[in-house]
Amino acid sequence: MSPLPENKPLRMVANQLVQVARQDIAAETPLFSIPRNTIICAATSTLRDRIPAVFDLERDDAGLSDFEDEDDLTSSSQDSWTLLILVLIYEYLRGDASPWKPYLDVLPSTFDTPMFWSPAELSELQASAVVAKVGKEDADRMIASKILSVVRAHEDVFFPRATDTLDDTQLLELAHRMGSAIMAYAFDLEKDDETDEANEDDEWVEDRAGKTMLGMVPMADILNADAEFNAHINHGEDALTATTLRAIKAGEEILNYYGPLSSAELLRRYGYVTATHSRYDVVELPWELVEMELRERVVGRTEPSDWERIDQLARSDEDFEESIVLERWSEDPDSAGQLGSAAVFTGLPDELAEQFKGFLKAAKKVANIELAVHALADKDMRKDLYLQVVLGALQTRERQYSTSLEDDERLLDKGGLTGRQEMAVWVRRGEKQLLREAQLWVRREAHEMRNKASERGGPDDGPAAKKRRL
């Protein structure tokens, strides 16, 4: 089954403007070039000179106190993300004094990323894991700790005229706006073909993990992006240059590339979805659903306290995952930005099978559960049990969505939805499609097992046979 509804050329772009070629353009043609000194970033804004201590990322602790953790949202330390938010706020508040005022004036004031959705709009995403990743409360805490605290400590820098001071609510709103603009439009300011030696004294590239400098690049962010694309931003020594990857005919849109992102992640980061990105859709399968299916097969034979110990032992493995990501196999775009064969679901992740086996070992060790003992001793039985359990978990995961795949396809075909509703339906529909493909794959695997057992001529009445009705 195709992962996309037939005759559904969905494409909801991040920008209202679509950049099209006015005439035929040959491959490898430079479209425009942006000098690095015109990029808005920590290296070009005067804010760095006004509050240099805030921009000092060279120390090992990056400004952390002895009691602060680098991952603590309440930490006052800065990173490339928060520094750029501070820079944009500073330049925005400067008004006419900022050399980037014309650019800042055309940045969107509203965004379609789920961060700005109402509770009713978010509910349209149903059971998609992206809902938990919106993180507005976390963002509010980060802004209060790393943005508002800096602005309040340096009000003479951000508000040279006391009459222009913003209250905390206004600052929070402005910080969210700038943070969303960064997520949608910012570039990592690395250079192509960079080497360690070349970067030792390079102000554009931070050598600490997660500290690559971010910048807003006027012109470069006018290009929309898709999974199939025809242009690329080359990072040169002195400039960023947009270049065509293949011939573009007059009237065709010029498209950049943001990476192999799922529909949900594309929506979360950039506030739009496209049909071609559906090939990269993923579904998170919570481990608790797998465990629940396994427990149902030994109900009444094990004490609840035993299950708690089994669960604790299984989770003590350093590689234990709370959720397993399911995805299709998809080849990378070629050098011209084009996609080849269709994306295909080719199997369950190896880590799911390993975690399942680890749980059986824990069940054997803690309570000597007969089913676990037999499954560990018989590879075919273990695979059969594994497929049964995973199929049940996949079916339960699909039922967590309040509408069916068919319901969503009818909604998309019928039309009449708001933009945000349609994007939400598209995201949840793609995840259900992937769940269906995974279930089909499991059933085929189970069918092949039965056929092989039949070909061997052995009686199908062993311990696993009683559970093989998939």
Identify the residue ranges that each predicted region occupies.
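Internal, well-ordered alpha/beta segment that forms a basic, Gly-enriched binding/recognition surface
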Residues: 69-121
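Long, positively charged leader/targeting segments at protein N-termini
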Residues: 1-38, 43-46, 98, 102-470
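Short peripheral tails and domain-boundary helices/loops at the edges of structured domains
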Residues: 49-92, 270-299
